[in-house]
Amino acid sequence: MKAKKILKLLLLLVFFSCQKNKNQETSSWTQITPKLFFQEREEKFYLKSGGHECSFPKEKLPFKKVIVLTTSQLGYISALGEEERISGIAGAQYVYSEKIRNLIQENKIQTVGTDQKYNLEKILALKADAVLTNYMPNLADTYEIFRKNGINVIFLDEYLEEKPLEKTAYIKLFGKFFGVEKKAEKIYQEIETNYLTLKNQAAKAGNSPAVLSGEMFGNHWFLAGGKTFAAQYFKDAGADYILKNNQDEKSISMSFEEIFSKSQSVQYWVNLSNYTTKKELLNKNPAYGKLRVFREGKIFAMNNRQKGDANDYFESGAIRTDLVLRDYIKIFHPEFFPNDTLVYMKELK
């Protein structure tokens, strides 16, 4: 019996020691969002972003030159006024910012390919401090080439965050990258205050209209899962999303028949791509005409700020989540902000 007690005591000591070490390890990281952490230790900067980790010498900070392969991250750089730190960009046709477009025309920012096919020689020649991008599994070999040539590849998947303000919070990391932490924190605090004020206003609305999102691609309807930032927008804007009880953190696909069944009481259909009229939408897929919301409800696309292929919802909208929320509130509850115009959304007539 005595031996068993000693064994139990030893096991407890090991358990609490492991817990202590685990807590110390966790507390040494600065958390920006549930998916984004960094720490500075032993002359190195460490970053955890989603399922990815990287490190580089602290002396690299602040970055002088970066290459951006995903235009959704340009909104953070523009908000900080650090556009001239960009030395290269992929998918230039998707850039909305007038300042960045001008820098490209002046050859101060080099185009380094499309968002799926990069000019490796050009990227390597630019000798940037870091490459910023979303992670694309099919480009894993390309990322390895960057690393072997001494380029820090930083994966930032802000679009996978579950809450809008968590997307905004990425500006804190960009502030760290460019040595403007105080400015980044101030911007975040202003947007957070605006967002929470708007959310509280929406909570006072007398109704929660039913909402459908997404559209058909091929034979499947793709729409936001119930644990995505889009679903959180709908909730914070005082709407009743048809997938509010769904547990998926990414977009999911459903058949048209499933959507038809779930959307009988829907009053608003939002988050469509670049359509300008209901007729154009119907020409794309005549089945839409069977939906009650198509005939009797209101439909909104995310293209009020669109220039060719460039859509500012995916650029400045990544950080200005307060403006996106205000759009949704104005859509779902027209009695709010009667004198304001929509920023990112546009109604299809």
Predicted ranges, named:
Residues Y46-G50, E59-L124, A130-Y135:
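A short, structured surface patch at a secondary-structure boundary
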Residues P62-K65, Y76, K108-T114, A130-T133, ...:
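Second-shell loop/turn segments in exported
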Residues I89-K99, N138-T142, D157-K172, N207-Q232:
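Extracytoplasmic ligand-binding site segments that recognize negatively charged/polar headgroups
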